[in-house]
From Swiss-Prot:
Miscellaneous note of the record: Heme 1 (or BL or b562) is low-potential and absorbs at about 562 nm, and heme 2 (or BH or b566) is high-potential and absorbs at about 566 nm.
Family per similarity comment: Belongs to the cytochrome b family.
Protein name, entry field: Cytochrome b
GO biological process: mitochondrial electron transport, ubiquinol to cytochrome c
Subunit details: The cytochrome bc1 complex contains 11 subunits: 3 respiratory subunits (MT-CYB, CYC1 and UQCRFS1), 2 core proteins (UQCRC1 and UQCRC2) and 6 low-molecular weight proteins (UQCRH/QCR6, UQCRB/QCR7, UQCRQ/QCR8, UQCR10/QCR9, UQCR11/QCR10 and a cleavage product of UQCRFS1). This cytochrome bc1 complex then forms a dimer.
């Protein structure tokens, strides 16, 4: 069996990726999130497939087909709740995974990092089109508001919006194509995940110290398979608790009302995992400026490797950078809170300051902190 595992063309790929993979001996639980994200993706694809068997992408029947799934399909309520809350778990793991990458300098593996940022954008796009499918009030108005942002693009904006809508408003054509996108994108994500892993396995994992781990590596199996399974069980317990005991905790009550183009909800807001970007969008009083800031809030991750000034890779031994990192984390929590509040004082000014500090910390303060720490580490004696 050992021989086959190492010689069979397919088994060899699996063996080199998940069994005999040399892994640093000191990677912490922060390195669990990659496998958790893989599991989230599998859960979402499977539950989504079963939902798609019963869902109809028509404006007249979409809302009632979701109700039918929850009421009449065997365990339909569970499948739907796991799928809806699985998206939240996906984003929790994503944010922690990206945060780990920033803290421990994983972004210096540039190919892996860049593919990861593109993956993040693709997952966000998938979640957005998926949120439109139940065709509730917030689905409809969320789709209307967010797609309308593209009209800020000079010259081609309005044409582009109507092209995406498939008409002059969000309607049947929009819902049908969003369902098509939502079905195909997870498989594109799956392919990109393979590329992400391919680039990662070219260099191997980083580790909490930021030092070269080649001198002390252990096989992935059994050490990290066991560790990943523990993380997986914890995640599944949290996901099932959420899906079974409070499935609507993270949703919007407006989505229990069927979509009505004649009635606007009092506060249009996206799902919680987009609120930080939505707050940045709203903090700029100009439409095009807001759209650019929204894009930059994610795309700024692409320039993080270029802004690395420290002689050390990880933040483990850099207290000033650590302080800035946790300030950035707090800042993102504030932005998430602001994104869910109405557009009135004091929320407007808090959102604007939080947006400015978000970009300032990443683009200006973190590189300066790296330079300062380098200076402080230089021997001062003659």
């Amino acid at each position: 069996m050992t021989n086959l595992r190492k010689t069979h063309p397919l088994m060899k790929i699996i063996n080199d990726s998940f069994i005999d993979l040399p892994t640093p001996s000191n990677i912490s639980a922060w390195w669990n999130f990659g496998s958790l994200l893989g599991m989230c993706l599998i859960i979402q694809i499977l539950t989504g497939l079963f939902l798609a068997m019963h869902y109809t992408s028509d404006t007249l029947t979409a809302f009632s087909s979701v109700a039918h799934i929850c009421r009449d399909v065997n365990y339909g309520w569970l499948i739907r709740n796991i799928h809806a809350n699985g998206a939240s778990m996906f984003f929790v793991c994503l944010f922690l995974h990206v945060g780990r990458g920033i803290y421990y300098g994983s972004y210096l593996y540039k190919e892996t990092w860049n593919i990861g940022v593109i993956l993040l954008l693709t997952v966000m796009a998938t979640a957005f089109v998926g949120y439109v499918l139940p065709w509730g009030q917030m689905s409809f108005w969320g789709a209307t508001v967010i797609t309308n942002l593209l009209s800020a693009i000079p010259y081609i904006g309005n044409t582009l919006v109507e092209w995406i809508w498939g008409g002059f408003s969000v309607d049947k054509a929009t819902l049908t194509r969003f369902f098509a996108f939502h079905f195909i994108l997870p498989f594109i994500i799956l392919a990109m995940v393979v590329v992400h892993l391919l680039f990662l396995h070219e260099t191997g994992s980083s580790n909490p110290t930021g030092l070269n781990p080649d001198s002390d590596k252990i096989p992935f199996h059994p050490y990290y398979t066991i560790k990943d399974i523990l993380g997986l069980f914890l995640m599944i317990i949290i996901l099932l608790s959420l899906a079974m005991f409070s499935p609507d905790l993270l949703g919007d009550p407006d989505n229990f009302t069927p979509a009505n183009p004649l009635n606007t909800p009092p506060h249009i807001k996206p799902e919680w995992y987009f609120l930080f970007a939505y707050a940045i969008l709203r903090s700029i009083p100009n439409k095009l400026g807001g759209v650019l800031a929204l894009l930059m809030s994610i795309l700024v991750l692409l320039i993080i490797p270029l802004l690395h000034t420290s002689t050390q890779r990880s933040m483990a031994f850099r207290p000033i950078s650590q302080t800035l990192f946790w300030m950035l984390t707090a800042n993102l929590i504030i932005l998430t809170w602001i994104g869910g509040q109405p557009v009135e004082q004091p929320y407007i000014i808090i959102g604007q300051w939080a947006s400015i500090s978000y970009f300032t910390i990443i683009i200006i303060l973190m590189p300066l902190a790296g330079m300062l720490e380098n200076y402080m580490l230089k021997p001062k004696f003659p």
